[in-house]
């Protein structure tokens, strides 16, 4: 799921679980980010997360459905089945990257930060990562 804010100049990858409370806290912090592109990789590792991930993935507007759930608690509805092999691929790639905690952030410079960050720390890391590229 790709979320462009402002000019989208700074980039960030987010590995996140739809049932993770720390992920939801991070999402609330990220609302204030400016001029960033966030690549959201849904990684269902907690109980009940796989069905939610599929419902979000199969929705007509993934980003809206994701934000409705993560920020507002609106349960994603599974309207129809769709190809969810991307979710399987995300899971396989995270194993290769040894990502087993959500949330996990990867910045443009390759720095990996597991856990929740404040908006100030997110901005700081995004700025630093952009300067090294």
Residue ranges of model-derived segments:
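A short, hydrophobic beta-strand/beta-hairpin element that forms part of a small beta-sheet core
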Residues: 94, 101-114
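Short coil/turn linker and secondary-structure boundary residues
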Residues: 61, 82-85, 117
């Amino acid at each position: 799921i790709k979320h462009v804010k402002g000019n989208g100049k700074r980039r960030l990858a987010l590995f996140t679980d739809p049932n993770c409370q720390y992920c939801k806290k991070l999402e609330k912090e990220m609302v204030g980010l400016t001029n960033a592109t966030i690549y959201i990789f849904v990684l269902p590792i907690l109980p009940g997360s796989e069905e939610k991930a599929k419902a979000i993935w199969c929705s007509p507007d993934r980003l809206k459905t994701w934000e409705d759930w993560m920020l507002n608690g609106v349960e994603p509805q599974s309207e129809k089945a769709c190809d969810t092999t991307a979710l399987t691929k995300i899971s396989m790639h995270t194993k290769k990257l040894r990502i087993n905690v959500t949330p996990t952030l990867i910045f443009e410079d390759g720095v990996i930060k597991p856990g929740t960050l404040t908006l100030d720390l997110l901005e700081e890391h995004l700025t630093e990562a952009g300067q090294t590229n």
